[in-house]
Amino acid sequence: MIKTNRAIVYRLYPNKKQVELFQKTFGCVRFVYNQMLSVQEERYKNNESHLSKFDMNLYCNHNLKTEYTWLKEVDKFALTNAIYHLEDSYQRMFKHLGKHPKYKNKHKSKKSYTTNFTNNNIEVGENYIKLPKAGKVKAKISLDTKCLQIKSATVTQNRDETYQVSILFEIIEEEPVQITPTEDNTIGLDYKSNGLYVSNTGTVANMPHYYRQSANNLAKQQRKLRNKVIGSKNYYKQQKKVAKIHRHIANQRKDYLHKESTAIAKQYAYVCVESLNMKAMSNRGFGNGKATLDNGYGMFLDMLAYKLQERGGDLVKVDKWFPSSQICNCCGFQNPILKDLTIRHWNCPNCGVTNIDRDINAAKNIKQEGLRLLGVA
């Protein structure tokens, strides 16, 4: 048996009083974060040692809450977790994995807070979620989680002023039996910039271009936003409309990728792909930056990885410099002229095979290389 953590996101429909509490908590969390960041910077200037997260928490309880009594009106775990998040940022900086923590801005920073489960203070009901201080908040519940152990909850206000809560559950389940890789339970996928992927079986995932579909409406709303006075009520109203379109696009994309990755994980145990640098490929120099960002291929691979591992399989990544598009899958001949990406079909001068589809051939080669890495081929 193994323990794993899994988060489930629920849409919240708070009443006016609960919204006020959430807003107050967001503000207090931001205030404590900025105050402790200021304390740490002041200690650094005075050549004093760095405060640990426990010392920062004591400082908050003994000093900040005494001076600013309104901090006691919100969930204490929210303030503690804000301090822990600040310490995490410092530790990342010390390990050269991130930059120095920055002060949180009221209008630009993400509005969220995290609270911990203790004494049944968090509960998922049939049509509500109970949260500390807020009580029962109306929610959209789609999964039965009564048998799962709750660890924490993160309340977030989206840019379009909708609310959601991400609840972290601890799941105890049997360790998946590792499946032996074979030719039949393995598939190769080649990245397709104007879709999603092409498989070695010839299946093409023509993912809808959700961003392009909403581009005209988004541009119209952004033009209206540009003409508003920054900081005015109408500016923030229009900003909410723009954010709603972005969230709709993101939800469409995520829904499609979940369905596509689940279908593949149910049919195959091992999926072979190229280890591409999606961030570099989205640069303007390639000429297809928007298409690359729109299809969310990196997110798709992340989904595939954990879904395959849950079933005893795995995602196999082939080296990005492997010339999958240049090698004839029938005879192994490497054709250098295929460095020209405009060539979509070609004839092999070595074995005589004609009308070879570039993408399907690449997917077949990726599968063969993946099987070799798995010790099958």
Model-flagged regions — what are they?
Residues 146, 160-377:
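Positively charged, helix-rich recognition surfaces that bind polyanionic ligands
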Residues 37-44, 90, 94-101, 171, ...:
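Long, hydrophobic, amphipathic alpha-helical segments used as structural scaffolds
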